[in-house]
Amino acid sequence: MKNILIFNDISGLGNCSMSANLPVFTKYGLYCMPVPTAVYSMQTGFDGFCVLPNVEAGAFAKKALALRSADAVYVGFCNDTATLSAVGDLLADNATKTAYKFVDPIMGDNGKL
């Protein structure tokens, strides 16, 4: 079974982000290693959402990669520059050097993709 390291946020309300990634990748026979980049009370399109501070995606991913190698890496929503920097460092690391890498622009394309 191939392993995929998934960086994305998770929301308590709103079936999107990590909640949508896991069943899709699992259906395709991949072993999922989810790494939350942010934890929200609800999807950010709802008014009044709140976010848990200081989600350490980089440290979380390093622990997972110490036990299992990644054949692929999926990068979804990163809510701040520190998280994006940690993910970038991991993508450059030897632990993910040979892994396929997929980056989802999460609407960063202004609707042009």
Where in the sequence are the language-model features?
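Small-residue (G/A/S/T)-rich helix-start motifs and N-terminal tracts that mark the onset
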Residues: M1-D71
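Conserved beta-alpha-beta core of the PfkB/ribokinase-like small-molecule kinase fold
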Residues: A72-L113
